[in-house]
Amino acid sequence: MSWWWAGAIGAAKATLKKFEEDETPKSFKSVGLVIGVTGMVGNSLAEILPLSDTPGGPWKVYGVARRPRPSWNADHPIEYIQCDVSDPNDTKSKLSQLTDVTHIFYVSWTMRTSEAENCETNGSMLRNVLRSVIPNAPNLRHICLQTGSKHYLGSFELLGKIQLHDPPFTEDLPRLNALNFYYHQEDILFEEIEKKEGLTWSVHRPAIIFGLSPYSLMNLVGSLCVYAAICKHEGKPLHFPGSKAAWNCYYEASEQFGIEEYGIVEGENRGLEEVMKGKEGVWEEIVKEEQLQKTSLEEVGNWWFADLAFFGGSAATQYE
């Protein structure tokens, strides 16, 4: 299976070609460092980059995440590094040794209770990584930073509360007059790349991302699958869990996801965060009956984000 087809159908679900012993190259032209390898994008990178027909590939891949390596990620042909990048000492100890890195893919983030805290924590995480790798990787050529559409819409706490630019949103629009950890990360990136001549960069700003990761804070597809499973288990109709505005508006996403079979019930203004209250036992029954990996409802459902996307005042819906 090729890298582009894997991406087109969802790399996480594809059965990808794995390296055989005699296929593994002795040296790699491209060496990727994926920060946040257990997230949706990081998990896909861990599958796609090592393929032989991936541009620049096959890549050697270092995958970094805070938690121990999960079983659903264990078959990816990468070198997994458990590292807390919010800890400068842990980051320097483990990442400064990666002297062969040519590309950094920074696809990690964490959520705090305020945007000021988001700026502080996420900025420190990125800075720790760059300061550990840039001085020690002589062949480092490019840094890819993933942020998102909140660059144009504002932080979660300000969605729908601040004046936005008129659409369409383009990369050269001035920043909004509000605190935003994406802006802070970009400033740190620009500051750090000046320390190495010839180092290039790119910033990617996707909107909703469809993919696989049980660890993602924003796994919309996974949450909807859990919602659908609970509806089926209880014999209830599968209604679209959002507003009419969210149903009708156009929205950019990185994979296709058909919702044609959903029904919209006029006047039912209940978000998934409310609907899923008290469903912990139902999910336990489903896990037992279907012999699924033991998880709690809280672990597999991100209801606040689903409500944000489909119902709870998302700024995107004002442009339907």
Question: For the regions a protein language model found, what residue spans apply to each?
Answer:
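N-terminal Rossmann NAD(P)H-binding glycine-rich loop of SDR-like oxidoreductase domains
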Residues: 3-4, 8-57
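Conserved glycine-rich Rossmann-like NAD(P)H-binding loop of the short-chain dehydrogenase/reductase
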Residues: 53-70
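NAD(P)H-binding glycine-rich loop region in Rossmannoid oxidoreductase-like domains
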Residues: 69-128, 134
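Conserved Rossmann-fold NAD(P)-dependent oxidoreductase catalytic core, especially the SDR/UDP-sugar
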Residues: 102-108, 117-181, 202
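Active-site Tyr-X1-5-Lys
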Residues: 172-204, 212
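NAD(P)-dependent short-chain dehydrogenase/reductase
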Residues: 195-248
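Mid/C-terminal beta-alpha module of Rossmann-like enzyme folds, strongest
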Residues: 244-306, 320
